Curated annotation (Swiss-Prot):
Family that this chain belongs to: Belongs to the bacterial ribosomal protein bS21 family.
GO BP annotations listed: translation
Region (Disordered): 52-76
GO molecular function, one term: structural constituent of ribosome
Official protein name in the record: Small ribosomal subunit protein bS21C
GO CC entries: ribonucleoprotein complex; ribosome
Entries under Pfam families matching the protein: Ribosomal_S21
Keyword Plastid: no
Top-level division of the source organism's lineage: Bacteria
Keywords: Ribonucleoprotein, Ribosomal protein
Length: 76
């Protein structure tokens, strides 16, 4: 992965690199590969993640249809 450093602004280039890595899922992949995960544990984790995604989608759809109240935004 490449990031262009403009005007010797390394901080900005580092922020852009981190954002790209985050979007690609590199940090998550590194965390998952730190230690061996048994196949049964991996399957259970993936199933739980899928259920969470489905619940989130259902909750968002219910909010769009007006069946659930939307979360109030916190004003600063």
């Amino acid at each position: 992965m490449q990031v262009l450093v403009r005007d010797n602004n390394v901080d900005q280039a580092l922020r852009i690199l981190k954002k790209k890595l985050q979007r690609e899922g590199v940090f998550r992949e590194m965390r998952l590969r730190e230690a061996f995960e048994k196949p049964s544990i991996k399957k259970a984790r993936e199933k739980a993640e899928a259920i969470g995604r489905q619940r989130k989608l259902a909750r968002k759809q219910m909010q769009r249809e007006g069946l659930l109240p939307t979360k109030p935004r916190k004003d600063k």
